[in-house]
């Protein structure tokens, strides 16, 4: 499921992030990938051990926990903590698929079900830099307002087009969902949204209760926790 979730961060939060990131020390993004990935990746990242990366990442995780649309769509179980990258001067990342299993700092592993990009640069601040996500329906071009999030299946082939002017700053992270199957997650998300709309419009209380029960029984059947 490809989903645009607006306003994860407020304008004030984005401005604070940018002020601090613009003054940060960045490293070559190729240091964080294997040999094949290094051939396609041309950007900068905050170092893995950066205190700033951890601090800003925690702010993002708190914001996500407060966002009902994100929870409904992702049904998150684990996160690979947010990282930060910057593309400028022709920086790009060619077509690739994210790794299936990632190592967490606590020694556990994460299955990458959902890939997330949180835009921290406004579209007018840079040229190029579109996130291109390829699936069975074709290619989708994504370039969102600062503070907005795009989520998509980690199995998707995707790339970042070259940034030919300005700088594209973003955070990116992965989620292991309670429901690994993307089709099942989408069905649950659609049902959850329908139940909420029925509640808001004064739908039949008994029918809403029954649908809510169906939702939770499907979640119980499909979830892995």
From Swiss-Prot:
Cofactor annotation remark: Binds 1 Fe(2+) ion per subunit.
Which GO MF terms are attached to this record? 2-oxoglutarate-dependent dioxygenase activity; iron ion binding; L-ascorbic acid binding
Can you tell me which residues the record assigns to a coiled coil?
none
The protein's enzyme class: oxidoreductase
Chain sites annotated for binding 2-oxoglutarate: 168
User: Which GO biological-process labels does this protein carry?
Assistant: DNA damage response; intracellular iron ion homeostasis
Keywords tagged on the record: Dioxygenase, Iron, Metal-binding, Oxidoreductase, Vitamin C
Database matches in InterPro entries = Oxoglu/Fe-dep_dioxygenase_dom (IPR005123), PKHD_C (IPR041097), PKHD_hydroxylase (IPR023550), Pro_4_hyd_alph (IPR006620), Pro_4_hyd_alph_FE2OG_OXY (IPR044862)
Binding-site positions, Fe cation = 96, 98, 158
Q: Which HAMAP family match?
A: Hydroxyl_YbiX
Entry protein name:
PKHD-type hydroxylase Smlt1146
Source organism (scientific name): Stenotrophomonas maltophilia (strain K279a)
